[in-house]
Design a protein with these regions (language model features):
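RecA-like P-loop NTPase motor core of helicase/translocase proteins
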Residues: 1-168
Length: 168
């Protein structure tokens, strides 16, 4: 029901072609990578696209498909920037229905939810915040044995800077 609800949100905003594209991406990723996930291994994927090309919308579709297929918890990483983290959190709240949506200060909400609804936690890539949430996950009995689906919405911040590397 999560993917269907998300696609309806997109289509209701008048963007039927985007909804169709998201559906196709989510189905492809779901069938090729999520359906046979062992829940014991680590899988890494990459969604490529130009700046402002709709990658976040496609990523939301993949999250919804994964929730439909039984994944209970998602961490959505943003750049270590308060404004970007808040913008992403607000977009998740506006676009994705039926999830327990948490910001970095919502550990109580996450714990109270106990994965009754799939949870999406939107976090900055900040060591202090990530350690805090690692402790939250480790201390809750309900996360034990459950997969955590981690999505990096700002992979440009995932690599080391090449500003001073001598490249032209």
């Amino acid at each position: 029901p999560y993917l269907k609800a998300y696609l309806k949100t997109i289509a209701d905003r008048g963007n039927v072609s985007l909804a169709e594209s998201i559906f196709q991406t989510a189905e492809d990723v779901g069938n090729q990578h999520i359906r046979d996930f062992s829940f014991c291994s680590h899988e890494i994927g990459l969604l490529l696209g130009n700046v402002q090309s709709g990658k976040t919308g496609q990523m939301f579709g993949i999250i919804c498909k994964a929730a439909d297929m039984g994944f209970p918890a998602f961490v959505l990483l943003t750049a270590d920037n308060v404004i970007l983290q808040q913008q992403t959190l607000e977009r998740v709240k506006a676009d994705l229905k039926g999830f327990c949506i948490c910001g970095e200060n919502d550990s109580g909400l996450f714990i109270e939810n106990r994965l009754m609804q799939p949870a999406i936690i939107v976090l900055k890539k900040n060591v202090r915040i990530l350690r805090l949430w690692a402790n939250v996950f480790a201390s809750t009995g309900f996360m034990k044995g459950n997969p955590l689906f981690i999505v990096d919405d700002d992979a440009a911040s995932a690599s080391s800077s090449t500003i001073n590397s001598g490249l032209p």
